[in-house]
Amino acid sequence: GLNYVVTVINLRTKGMSMTRLPLTIWAFMVTAILGVLSFPVLVSAVVLLLMDRTMGTAFYLSDIFIGGEALDVTGGSPILYQHLFWFLGHPEVYIVLLPALGISSEVIATNARKPIFGYKAMVGSILGIGFLSFIVWGHHMFVTGMNPFLGSVFVFTTLLIAIPSAVKAFNYITTLWQGNIRFTPAMLFSVGLVSTFVTGGLTG
């Protein structure tokens, strides 16, 4: 991930400013940043789990009985594991999605025979999705008994992520509007991706 980010920042061709990068490259770079920041958290969670299983620690074990006897070491919480897991688990959704959206941006613009509508807004939405993906993980955990105020914060941040997502969807539609469209297989897949993206956003 670091290799990709450094390559994009330092090894662009002459005259290629950051504001002229293809949207595919923006999407790949943000995806790399998500991977660099989120996977170490999961690795830490797994290391703590291995310590619980093999070394007698209690990071994830609360007051628990095994074989009729109380554990000597308690005080942890299985909810901690969920927090650590979903801190990767939600950015991972965008690790999967953003590269596909980046490629679709180029495919749609090429086959509509128009420049992508709202390039800077599209870059901003990619960056916004990347940032917001790190502060919405709690929406996977509403039934765990978390603090209701904290739950409402996660509801709010989850609603916020609809804004950059909608910007991308409407910009794709506007790019298609009155374009000289070629319905190539790549174009059909890309339009299908936008449709699925909108449907998935509405239904969760």
For the regions a language model picked out, list residue spans one by one:
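Membrane-embedded and interfacial regions of multi-pass energy-transducing membrane proteins
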Residues: 1-204
